[in-house]
Amino acid sequence: MKKINKQALIDLVEQKQLKAYVPEFSAGDEVNVAIKLKEKEKVRIQNFTGTVLRRRGKGISETFIVRKTTDGIPIEKNFQIHNPNISIELKRRGKVRRAYISYMRERSGKAAKIKERKQ
């Protein structure tokens, strides 16, 4: 019997959990995250559309932060990219020079706009 080390076993299990397709996006992009919520027997989809502040990690633990403003109240949510209960749709590409645009937290209104990246 072949002996497998712990890390190889972990990698093997994680590989099965990864999504087959994840859209390519980065900080500054506008995405729509459709979250499947199960309420008793009923399953409903809640959309969360906003700007990606950061994408970090790799493999099964890769995450990203999305920020949106609703009625003047800013909301930020952390999502796991390979979560089977979410689907990610890229709305538009944003032009930023940083991997983590934390300065967007202090901005509101017109100052919070991000230029669109040309293809």
Swiss-Prot record:
One short Pfam name that applies is: Ribosomal_L19
Q: Which UniProt keywords apply?
A: Ribonucleoprotein, Ribosomal protein
Statement: the UniProt record of this protein carries the keyword DNA repair:
no
Gene Ontology terms: biological process: translation
> One cellular component GO annotation, for this chain's record?
cytosolic large ribosomal subunit
**InterPro entries (UniProt xref):** Ribosomal_bL19, Ribosomal_bL19_CS, Ribosomal_bL19_sf, Translation_prot_SH3-like_sf
> Origin, by domain of life?
Bacteria
Asked if the keyword Ligase belongs to this entry, the reply reads no
Citing just one GO molecular function, the answer is: structural constituent of ribosome
User: In UniProt terms, what function does this protein have?
Assistant: This protein is located at the 30S-50S ribosomal subunit interface and may play a role in the structure and function of the aminoacyl-tRNA binding site.
Similarity comment: family membership: Belongs to the bacterial ribosomal protein bL19 family.
- Name of the protein this chain belongs to: Large ribosomal subunit protein bL19
Q: Which organism is it from?
A: Mycoplasma pneumoniae (strain ATCC 29342 / M129 / Subtype 1)
